[in-house]
Amino acid sequence: MSVLKSKNTKHKKISSTFLAFVSPSLEAMGMPPGERERDTLLKVCWGVWNAVVYADYVGRTDLLNKLLDPSLSSPAGVVLINGLVERKRSRRFADDDRLIGDYKIKDVNGEPRLWAEASSPYPKSA
């Protein structure tokens, strides 16, 4: 049972959704990234996804503002983050109010597989 307010039953598993969100960024790297680069990119995508969910659904913009602060990131980093924010707010992902909690990349038969857990950004009712 979903604890999310949208109760959108069309949502796929969060791991599938997150992979679809991340894939264009991985593909833009040209060749398959090394494990370190891949993990760094996943961490950035994870942070942007969650910051946008908090900003758009809870009204908490401090996390997104920090990610977009040019004094805390390189110009290329800000461009990447802006692109990810735009992608999260695109028609494909905008109605997904799930936070991405823990995630892991596992190797299954030589293929990387993404596992992720979803959680609600909304405060629990007392």
Which residues does each PLM region occupy?
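Short terminal alpha-helical segments
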Residues: 6-50
